[in-house]
Amino acid sequence: MLQGFHWYSEGDAKLYENTKNSADYLKELGISAIWLPPAYKAAGGGYSVGYDPYDLFDLGEFEQKGTVSTKYGNKKQYLDCTKTLQEKGISVIVDIVLNHKAGGDETEKFHAIKVNPENRQQNVSDPFEIESYTKFTFPGREKKYSAFEWNFTCFSGVDYALNQEEGIFQIIHDFGDGWEEMIDDEKGNYDYLMYNDIDQRNPFVRKELNDWGKWYHDQVHFDGVRLDAVKHQSPDFYKEWLYNLRSNTQKNIFAVGEYWAPGEVNLLQKYIDTTEGSMSLFDSSLQQNFHIASKEGANYDLRKIFDETLTLLNPTHSVTVVDNHDTQPLQDLEAPVEKWFKPLAYALILLRENGYPCVFYPDLFGANYTDKDKEGNEQEIFLDKVEKIDELLKARQEFAYGFQRDYFDDANSLGWTREGNDDHSGCAVVLSNKDAGEKNMPEVFFTITSAGFQKK
C-alpha cells in the first residue's frame, strides 16, 4: 500500500491528477493499493488537509467553505483518479473521518459541563448554558444526497463556547450519559479529541453514518477504508459500521484503523478483539522502534526491533509503516525515522512475511515544505526519496516469497532468508546498523547495488 499524500502535499487541486498520471509507475513498482486523503469538504476549505471534516457528502461538488474543490481537486477529478487506479489494478483505500465535525453553520444554546482536559471524568463546573457552532445545515448542498441536519444532540462535546475561555465542554442531552465508553482510561476517557465530537450513541447519527457509507461506496466503488482516530471512538460503533458497509456493498472491504499508541501493543490487540477482527491496525509500536533505532545508531540492539509490536503479536492484523503524515517532521506526533535507517526499515517491512507494508509518499517521491516548530520558529524541511526504495519494492515483487528463516543472532546485524516458491527464487537479506560485516546463512540469492539487482 502507498499512503498517497502527506501533511504538506501540494494544493491547487493537483493531487488527484498527479496520482492518476503516476498509476503506471506505481503499478510497475508493485503498489497494489493507494490510500488517498480525506476527499470531502472540510472546514478549512481548499487549504485543509481534510481532518476537519465539514460535509461528508461534498466530494468537491458544491460551493461551500469558500470553494468547490477540496485541496486535492473536484469530484470529477477524484472519480477519474479512482477509476484510473482501479483500471490499472490498484485498489483504492479511502480515508474515513467519523470522530468529529468542524465548521458548523449556526450556533445553538445548550447545557454542558466543563471538564479537566487531563482527566475528562473530572468535572470542573456545574451544568451551565453555553453557545457553540453545533448546527450543520450545509446550505451550499441544498439537501442533495441527504436532508439530515446536525444539532447539539449529535455531539458529545466541543472545545469552544462563545463568551467562554477555551476548554472541553461535555454536552448534556438525552442520547447518552457522559462520554462514550473507550477501551482505555487515558485522560480519564479519551472519547473527546477535537472540534465537535460526534456522539455515535445517537441512533439518528448512526443511521446517517451508515447510510453515508453506502452512498460513498456507490459514488467511488472503493476497495478499502482507513479509519481515522479509532482510539477515540467506540469499537462497538465501528464493528457495526463495517458490518453494514460490507453487507450493503456485498464486498469484503479491507479496513485499517489508526489507533496510535506506541509501546502499548496490548491496547491495539484489545481493540482488534473488541471489534471481532473486523479491522487491522497500523503498528505504531514498530514505527516507534524504527524511530528509536535510527536515533541510537549502533547502540540499538536490532534483535529487539520487533519486540512489543503488533507485527509480532498479531501479524495478520498489522499494517506496517516507517513514517506517516502525523510522525513526519513538524507534526503533532513527530517521530521521524532518520534518513540513514530508512532503507533498513523498509527492508524490514517489505521483504519479510509478516504485516501489510505501507509506503509513505515522501519516501517514494521526496518532499519539501516549511512550517513552524514547537517553539514557533519557521523551519524548512527537505525529505529525500529513500535510497534504493524502488529496488526494495521490486525485490518484494520478484523475490520475497516462501518460508522465512530468521538469523537474529547479533545486536548489530540481522538476517533472514525467504525460500521462494515455484515461480520465485527467494532471497537472503542482511542488515547492519554498524560497520560492514558478514553473516552465515544457507544461500544468498541477490544483492542490491546502484546498478540494480545482482543475483548470486
Outline where the language-model segments fall.
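A short, flexible beta-alpha/helix-coil linker loop
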Residues: 6-9, 195, 327-329, 367
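Soluble non-cytosolic domains of exported or imported proteins
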Residues: 10-17, 72, 76, 203, ...
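An N-terminal domain-start capping segment
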Residues: 1-15, 133-144, 152-174, 270-272, ...
